[in-house]
Amino acid sequence: VLVHKVGDTLANLTFRLLFDDLGYTNDEIAVYDVGVGFWAFLIGIFVGGLIFGRWGLQRSVLLALVLMAISNLSFAGLAAAGHSNLGLAAAIGFENFASGYGGVVVVAYFSALCNLRFTAAQYALISAAASVIGRVLTGTTAGSLIESIGYVDFYLLTTLAALPGVLLFVFMMRRGLVEESLGSAGRNRS
C-alpha cells in the first residue's frame, strides 16, 4: 500500500493545476467537487463497507488498489478532452468513489496490521509513512513532469507508478504473506 501511494499522491497534487489550465472557474470546480465528488465519496464508503463484509480484507484491498490506480486514467481522459463539464463530473466522481472505497478498506487493512496493545501508535506510524513517502518522492517532480510530457502522459504515468504496489500486493496474497502479516484479522474471509 505504501508503494501504491506514490502514483496516487503524484496525481492528487496536480488536479487543481489541471483544472486551472483547462479553464474551469472556481464555481465550476466547487459545483462538481462538492456536488458530485462528495456524494461519490459517500457512495464509495458505503460500497467499500459492503464489499469488505462480503469479500473479506484481502480481496477488498486488492480492488481498492486497482480502483485507486485506474482513477488517474479519468484525469488523462479529461486532459485529452479539454474543458468538459461532463468530463470533470465523471473524473471527480470516479476519483472520489475510489477514494471513499479505498479509504474504508485501507483503514481496515492498516488497523489489522497493528498490534492491539499499540494500535494508535502503530496506525499513526503506518499512515504517516504512507503520506510522507508519497509526498516526499512526488512533491518536487510533478510540475516539471507535466511541463515536459503534458497532462495526458503524466496521468498515464501516475497510473503506471501505482502498478508495482498492486502487483506486489497480488504477489504477497499468492504467497500467503498478507494473511501471515494480518494474523487472525485476515483469515475469516480471504
Q: Model-flagged regions — what are they?
A:
Residues 100-115, 125:
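Intracellular juxtamembrane helix-capping segments at the cytosolic ends
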Residues 4, 13-30:
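Short amphipathic helix-loop junctions that connect adjacent transmembrane helices
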Residues 113, 117-147:
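A late C-terminal transmembrane helix in Major Facilitator Superfamily
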Residues 43-60, 146-147:
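Helix-to-loop junctions at the C-terminal end of transmembrane segments
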Residues 3-12, 103:
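Conserved extracellular-gate-facing transmembrane-helix segments in secondary transporters
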Residues 140-164:
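A membrane-interface helix-boundary motif in multi-pass transporters
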Residues 156-189:
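Multi-pass alpha-helical transporter architecture, strongest
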Residues 66-83:
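C-terminal ends and interior cores of transmembrane alpha-helices
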